């Protein structure tokens, strides 16, 4: 029976339409996975997207993390960190302490909210996750609004594509051109993730 099944399978593989079908399904799966992973990056790069500039950014999150174990409470987070993760409520935690709802486990001692570890007074930080967490402090709202008002039109379109305070901090810390000295050189190779208005000091060449 096994030999018969193997023989039938080999005969099927010799047919071009079967190979084409297998290849097509594999290609669809690959493209679907790629598009899901790149969805946020594509939106950040869409400089030509049209938005209503009179619509204010909603700075308040829609739920309170007071009981983060509630299944109805879902958190977006910074996703890509290998060791650290920042959720949309400003908590930084180790990846292993991330709950299934996407929120950091606030009962773990190492989890910190609005953490500015490794961040300089100019708003530049040594780690992307700390940059986002520090940027999410409520008192940073005026600074971020001032930045948006001063941004060039094309640059402003990029940041107006975000929907709230969390997405603005994700984009600001990830795409800040102020931290670049030359094409492939950071002004400060240590504190290169910036949410603030002032660029880092020039690093000696």
From Swiss-Prot:
UniProt effect for mutating residue 67 to Q: Loss of glycosylation
GO biological process entries? positive regulation of SREBP signaling pathway
Q: Which residues are glycosylated?
A: 67
Subcellular location as annotated: Golgi apparatus membrane
UniProt keyword Membrane present: yes
InterPro entries attached here? SPRING1
Transmembrane region positions? 17-35
Bilayer disposition of the protein: Single-pass membrane protein
According to the UniProt topology, which residue ranges lie Cytoplasmic? 1-16
Gene Ontology CC: one annotated term: Golgi membrane
> A Pfam family this protein belongs to?
SPRING1
Membrane side Lumenal: residue ranges: 36-205
Q: What keywords does the record list, in alphabetical order? A: Glycoprotein, Golgi apparatus, Membrane, Transmembrane, Transmembrane helix
Q: How does it assemble?
A: Interacts with SCAP.
What job does this protein perform? Answer: Positively regulates hepatic SREBP signaling pathway by modulating the proper localization of SCAP (SREBP cleavage-activating protein) to the endoplasmic reticulum, thereby controlling the level of functional SCAP.
Similarity comment: Belongs to the SPRING family.
Q: Can you say what this protein is called?
A: SREBP regulating gene protein
**Organism whose genome encodes this protein:** Homo sapiens (Human)
Q: Which gene encodes it?
A: SPRING1
